[in-house]
Amino acid sequence: MKFIVKLYPEIMMKSKPVRMRFTKMLETNIRNVLKKVDEDAKVQRQWDRIMVMVPKDKPELAQAFGERLACIPGIAHVVQVDEYSFESVDDIYQQVLPVYRDQLAGKTFCVRVKRTGDHDFNSIEVERYVGGGLNQFTDALGVRLKNPDITVNLEIERDNLYMVTKRIEGLGGFPMATQEDVLSLISGGFDSGVSSYQFIKKGARTHYCFFNLGGAQHEIGVKQVAYHLWKTYGESHKVKFISVPFEPVVAEILERIDNGQMGVVLKRMMMRTAARIADRMGIQALVTGESLGQVSSQTLTNLNVIDRCTELLILRPLIAMDKQDIINESRKIGTEDFAKSMPEYCGVISQKPTVKAVLAKVEAEEKKFSEDLIDQIIAQSVTIDIREIAEQMDTRITETETVASIDTNQVVIDIRAPEEEESKPLQIEGIEIKRIPFFKLATQFADLDKQKTYLLYCERGVMSKLQALYLIEQGYTNVKVYRP
């Protein structure tokens, strides 16, 4: 069994040297991701495709490989195929017939062939021959070239016949690390998650800068979003997560800055700080989730004033998107449930925000800040490899707080998102299971019976550890992590 990875069309249009570089990078990225699934994964680059071989003794890996390939930037689509050899067109038909005989009963069908290499036949001739044979020697209703019930997809490469069993749509975009790095300002809401994803998809290693305005719970939530985006779409490369304690800035804004200018000043301080951090990391651009007119600080006038605080390029991929489109995209990429539970702090600090800030007035207000304020918060910022988010949780959740077996008096809480829980329901005989999504756990845990011990469960164990850590920090001692 193999997967044939088709390159995104924009890659195919590049010059030969660029196309070669992009294809090599995509091959490396695929190998880096799939090696984490299975060390025996084999990836082979060709001029216009990449072949991924599933180990013959591990056919069960096909689903995991397919799921990972669907989330790697630079891929148009992936076809899962079974491989055969052939000597003639009739030989092709004879191998297709037993595979599709039962499937075609009572169905309309057509045959589609893609061919590369030198042969004494063309693709249309194969389609006609195989289609005619299937129509005659199966119980199919007949051939229908438009909107058939079943399409028999075949790919012929020299002496190899690939029978397509499944097609998986890819992300598109460019392979990771074919573009320069960016630093994304992430708050955990709908916008910043989607804007970060857009640049991952575009092939830029996306590092994360978080301005902490809401304490430990806010940071834990944002780390969950960043880790999800990296683990799902950018796992082939290392990135950094920078947490900046921004409460001192907010405190000075509330004490010293004119009420109408607060929102714009806060954003300018964030951009200044992020630009300093980006410069230290050798990064040339910032990414934000701002969308034109969505809030008062995002008018054209205010965005122009915000941009004047730094010479660094500020990229806004969502600038013309409607809010509902952003929410729909967050649902598609898996960040919607995180965003629903994330508090919004930036919009509440100004009661009458200006929509037409004047640069001179804003700069005059900013002179009221302490001289070394940005230096102080940068010095207190914490930079970690994003992989350490999971590792830190492993270290801070002790062995006594992680269990693999369950006592009858313990209760398991499935904290997965509703869609994930429905697709793979957790069932443990004789054990009570409560279903509380992670984004509701912080508010609902206090209502549970304090005499019982609760074991948090999620698929990968990262989110359950983050949530357990937060609850423990809040003083709860009756919570552990369940890792079967």
UniProtKB/Swiss-Prot annotation:
PROSITE patterns: RHODANESE_3 (PS50206), THUMP (PS51165)
Main location: cytoplasm
Catalytic function, reaction form: [ThiI sulfur-carrier protein]-S-sulfanyl-L-cysteine + a uridine in tRNA + 2 reduced [2Fe-2S]-[ferredoxin] + ATP + H(+) = [ThiI sulfur-carrier protein]-L-cysteine + a 4-thiouridine in tRNA + 2 oxidized [2Fe-2S]-[ferredoxin] + AMP + diphosphate; [ThiS sulfur-carrier protein]-C-terminal Gly-Gly-AMP + S-sulfanyl-L-cysteinyl-[cysteine desulfurase] + AH2 = [ThiS sulfur-carrier protein]-C-terminal-Gly-aminoethanethioate + L-cysteinyl-[cysteine desulfurase] + A + AMP + 2 H(+)
Cell location: Cytoplasm
InterPro entries in UniProt: Rhodanese-like_dom, Rhodanese-like_dom_sf, Rossmann-like_a/b/a_fold, ThiI_AANH, ThiI_fer, ThiI_N, THII_Thiazole_biosynth_dom, THUMP_dom
Top-level taxon of origin: Bacteria
PANTHER family per UniProt: TRNA SULFURTRANSFERASE
Protein's UniProt name: tRNA sulfurtransferase
Lineage: Bacteria, Pseudomonadati, Pseudomonadota, Gammaproteobacteria, Alteromonadales
